[in-house]
């Protein structure tokens, strides 16, 4: 068996407007599909950034993770050209970031920030 690549990653968010503002308007994802699913009482968004697809289920009644170190998805990481410049851009959009760190395993700069539902997101050179 040979797996070619990751096709998509799925996250669950609570608020449609916040999700669109954050992922589309601020982070630059494109909406490729949007479906309101009455049977599941949610909205399914398929977003794209480069070759990567992010599938988002907007479920207003979804519980939040109590803390990030639970079993399952820990965080999403995005590769960027320049962490320092990206941090400035995020901060200008009103998105708080942690201090920039040096990843001793990769030899690259990186830091974290959170989406509106507190999902940790990483930028990494």
Language-model features and meaning:
Residues 1-5, 30-77, 88-114:
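Vicinal oxygen chelate
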């Amino acid at each position: 068996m040979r797996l070619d690549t990751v096709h998509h990653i799925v996250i669950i968010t609570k608020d449609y407007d916040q999700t669109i503002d954050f992922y589309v308007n601020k982070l630059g994802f494109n909406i490729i599909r949007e479906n309101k699913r009455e049977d599941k009482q949610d909205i399914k968004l398929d977003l794209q950034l480069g070759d990567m697809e992010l599938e988002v289920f907007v479920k207003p009644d979804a519980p939040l993770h109590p803390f990030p170190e639970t079993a399952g998805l820990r965080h999403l990481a995005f590769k960027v050209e320049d962490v320092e410049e990206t941090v400035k851009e995020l901060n200008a959009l009103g998105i708080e970031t942690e201090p920039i760190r040096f990843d001793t395993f990769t030899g690259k700069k990186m830091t974290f920030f959170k989406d509106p539902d507190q999902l940790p997101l990483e930028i990494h050179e």
